[in-house]
UniProtKB/Swiss-Prot annotation:
Part of the 50S ribosomal subunit; part of the 5S rRNA/L5/L18/L25 subcomplex. Contacts the 5S rRNA and the P site tRNA. Forms a bridge to the 30S subunit in the 70S ribosome. Keywords: Ribonucleoprotein, Ribosomal protein, RNA-binding, rRNA-binding, tRNA-binding. This is Large ribosomal subunit protein uL5. HAMAP family: Ribosomal_uL5_B. It comes from the Bacteria.
Amino acid sequence: MSRLYLYYKNKVIPNLIKKFNYSSIMAVPQIIKITLNMGIGKSIINKKILDYAIDDLTKISGQKPIITIAKKSIASFKIRKGYPIGCKVTLRGRRKWDFFDKLITIVIPRIRDFRGMSRKSFDGRGNYSLGIREQIIFPEINYEKIDSIRGMDITITTNSKSNQEGECLLTEFDFPFQK
């Protein structure tokens, strides 16, 4: 079992039951999945850029990403329907817990000029999204071997009913929100 999963079972669930007076353990919010998305607009010019992004996302997540394809043509972006425009990976189960542990303990503290994550990034249903500007903050990425710095979006999907429940869930894991 993952260290963070055991922490969730032993500490987070009892604390949230006490705070929100849930009648059942099954009513306690939990993290359902973590989605990592890398949008690469330059991939229409050079196909190698997409391969490098897939390689980076594979190293970061430990899972092979799928290529996202444009749903419709947009002339101003020079995109046609069916063009590859990025890649994404969805983490569930043990990989989800391992990645979340790595995100909290290693990756977020390595962000330059970090002052805490915004509390406004919840979507109204307790899901949290954050953007990372450079992939080199992940320990799996070798700084000397990257072709360019790319960012990514990370979405933490929970089954909580409100932003308050989602925020309390992430706060129990010591997620670094702004004061």
